[in-house]
């Protein structure tokens, strides 16, 4: 899923049919990359997509000086980092550990909260970017260029968990583009995820 976000206008979500894969430049032309402020690329790479397509999209976005938000993990994330450092990475705790802290085939690796905080801070400092690690019903751990943030989740009457992560990502990126305020962006993302959890319609925060 690709979202292109422009402040004061709508957010367009483009779901690409894996049976009709466009060339990378055609995808970004469809996104009107010169007209947007940021690009959010979320979800696992579908079968049929080339292994380097995510990294190429990131590279082109960053070459156009756009904020690039990565909401995926594993080999695709590592391949992208080798080619172009993301502005923002958002993954859950298990994905962070499996991507950055151990072999991707390892299982049942866990860390204390303090250990996890240190790893997020160090990785953010190394990559000189923002890393957000969601932890389900526990507070969200984040770091921006080595500065740590912790954001409590909102307690709601959840009726749906589908698309909560996507809602968080979209809310965070929208606020970050608008204000560049990390705390405000984390709060907006948290609010959007909570509203989605309260809705029977996944992806809806109205």
Region annotations inferred by a language model:
Residues 14-17, 45-49, 76, 98, ...:
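Short, small-residue-enriched loops and turns at beta-alpha junctions
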Residues 1-37:
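Conserved N-terminal subdomain of the carbohydrate kinase-like
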Residues 59, 106-206:
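Conserved phosphate-binding/catalytic region of the ribokinase-like
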Residues 24-27, 53, 57, 119:
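A general structural detector for well-ordered alpha-helical segments in enzyme core domains, enriched
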Residues 8-11, 40-42, 71, 134:
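Short beta-strand segments
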Residues 33, 81-83, 125:
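A short, aliphatic-rich alpha-helical micro-motif
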Residues 38-111:
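Conserved beta-alpha-beta core of the PfkB/ribokinase-like small-molecule kinase fold
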């Amino acid at each position: 899923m690709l979202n292109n976000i422009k402040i004061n206008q709508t957010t367009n979500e483009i779901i690409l049919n894996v049976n009709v894969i466009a060339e990378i430049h055609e995808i970004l032309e469809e996104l009107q990359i010169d007209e947007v402020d940021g690009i959010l690329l979320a979800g696992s790479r579908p079968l049929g997509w080339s292994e380097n397509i995510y990294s190429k999209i990131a590279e082109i976005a960053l070459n156009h000086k756009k904020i690039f938000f990565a909401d995926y993990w594993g080999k695709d994330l590592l391949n992208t980092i080798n080619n172009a450092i993301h502005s923002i990475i958002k993954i859950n705790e298990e994905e962070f550990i499996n991507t950055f802290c151990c072999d991707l085939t390892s299982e049942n690796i866990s860390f204390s909260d303090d250990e996890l905080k240190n790893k997020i801070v160090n990785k953010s400092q190394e990559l000189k970017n923002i890393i957000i690690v969601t932890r389900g019903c526990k507070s969200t751990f984040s770091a921006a260029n080595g500065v740590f943030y912790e954001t409590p989740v909102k307690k709601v009457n959840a009726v749906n968990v589908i698309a909560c992560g996507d809602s968080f990502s979209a809310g965070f990126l929208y606020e970050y583009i608008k204000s560049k305020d990390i705390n405000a962006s984390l709060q907006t993302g948290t609010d959007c995820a909570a509203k989605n959890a309260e809705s029977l319609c996944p992806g809806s925060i109205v």
